[in-house]
C-alpha cells in the first residue's frame, strides 16, 4: 500500500510541476510574441519536449527534466523558482 500511495503522490507532484511550467510558458510566449518552434530552436530544447510541456494536463506521465526547466529560465532571464511558480520564503 505504501508504494501505491507514494506513486500517487509522485504523480500529483509531477503533474503539478508540468502544469506550472506550461502556465509559465503560455504567459511568456504570449508576452514575447514567440512560438513553440522558435523557443525550441533558441533554447536547444527538442520541439517534441516543448510540445509535451504544452500538453501537460493531457500527458499525465510527462515530467520535464531539470535541465529543460533551467534552459527555459535562462532564456527568459529568470529563476527556476519563477518557472515552476515556487514561492521562496526569506527567513531574515
Curated annotation (Swiss-Prot):
Keywords: DNA-binding, Transcription, Transcription regulation. Pfam families: HTH_26. It comes from the Bacteria. This is Uncharacterized HTH-type transcriptional regulator RP766. Gene3D superfamilies: lambda repressor-like DNA-binding domains (1.10.260.40). Residues 25-83 form the HTH cro/C1-type domain. The keyword Metal-binding does not apply. The keyword tRNA processing does not apply. Residues 36-55 bind DNA. InterPro entries: Cro/C1-type_HTH, Lambda_DNA-bd_dom_sf. GO terms for molecular function: DNA binding. CDD domains: HTH_XRE.
